[in-house]
Amino acid sequence: FQSWARPAAPATRNSDTYFAGLAHDWNSGHAAWHNGLHDSWVAAKSQQTMAYFTSQDIPYYYALAQAFTVCDGYHCSQLGPTNPNRLYLWTGCCGNVAGATPHIDNGTYGANWTTLPERLNAAGVSWKFYQDRGQGLDHGSGFGEYPTGGGGDLWWNGNYGDNTVLNFARYQNLAAGDPLAPALNGTQIDPKGNGTPYDTRLFQQLQADVANGTLPQVSWIVAPYAYSEHPSWATSGGEWYVSNILDALTANPEVWAS
């Protein structure tokens, strides 16, 4: 109950509900937080912030939650937008180190500090990214952001530009044998940008590594836009994507048991 607005389930009772994105910038996040009172969410982000899903809407996710331990105390690292939180995911901070200023917007300027893949290399821990390359993982291709082609933007392949380490200069123009080259690993199911919905070729590399027992010690999976559950895409796309990942992992009982 916030600002006289009660929680509300979506009108369409299934996971194909498409919600528009709410404000998720630094200013609105801190306004909703309100110095720890957390009482200004509706005022800062509209009444839609009170929406929620039930087991009827997202049955697959509820089934997973009932079958497995789920870390449900999940919070973002920064009360701010997407890229600073992805910088936390892959570097442990959003700047303010190595001479870089703190990032509180979606810019990736001046990203020059040490990333987690580099720390894993130094510790002798293997790692790999599983993603689709879209039309390419270089700067000119948007680092794998959803491709453009045909009649307009397509969202079924690429990685939505969400592999943020690729914005660091040292990850660009990597040679094949470079220790950071696993950041460029990925399928490329349609380099021309004519994506096909629900294409299981997205999981070929993960399936092969599971089957061959060659999974790295740390794996990062970066989904295309349509399956990321980022507004305005539906939860059903994320459920399909997660189910294919679990199908790949459980296909090898020895790997699954580990």
Which residue stretches match the model-derived regions?
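N-terminal pro-sequences and low-complexity stem/linker regions of secreted or lumenal proteins
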Residues: 1-258
